[in-house]
Amino acid sequence: MKIIKYTEKEIPDVLDFEKKLRDEEDVWGWEIDDEYIKSVKASFHDGRFNDTVSLLAYDNEKIVGRIDACILPSRFDGSVKAYLDWICVVKSSRHKGVAQALLSELKNKLKEKGINTIIALTASNDEAQRFYKSIPDSERHDTGIWINIK
């Protein structure tokens, strides 16, 4: 397995990965349509995405996992944290250390940027909960809320 930075040239592989996710589990809440693809491509040319860290795990030339985080500076306490936006491994590659390897590499990249804390909203399914409990040096707090801005 190798882990690389997600760049624009990997978009076709990422789309294949997302299709495989849906083939293996029907739990994903958005469609891979033209609008979605257009938004993903545009994100690589939008300065608002400059402080993101996105990594891909490849096995046998196919993406089997992905992790995405963004940097969150806060004047509340003068800290800079990272928000774990997404971590996912295709079902057929789970329980093989892919998610832990992605998280470890993300932590290395964030440490290079002087960031020492990752915050995340957590999925409630049992498999995800087992993963979260396996993360060393972590504490669980509160729950999450999504607020739509209309």
Residue ranges and their predicted role:
Residues 89, 95-108, 134:
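Conserved acetyl-CoA-binding loop-helix of GNAT-fold acetyltransferases
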Residues 42-56, 83:
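A short helix-loop-beta-strand connector motif used in the catalytic cores of GNAT acetyltransferases and
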Residues 100, 116, 123-149:
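Conserved active-site alpha-helix within GNAT-family acetyltransferase domains
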Residues 2-16, 27:
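A short beta-loop-alpha structural element at the N-terminal edge
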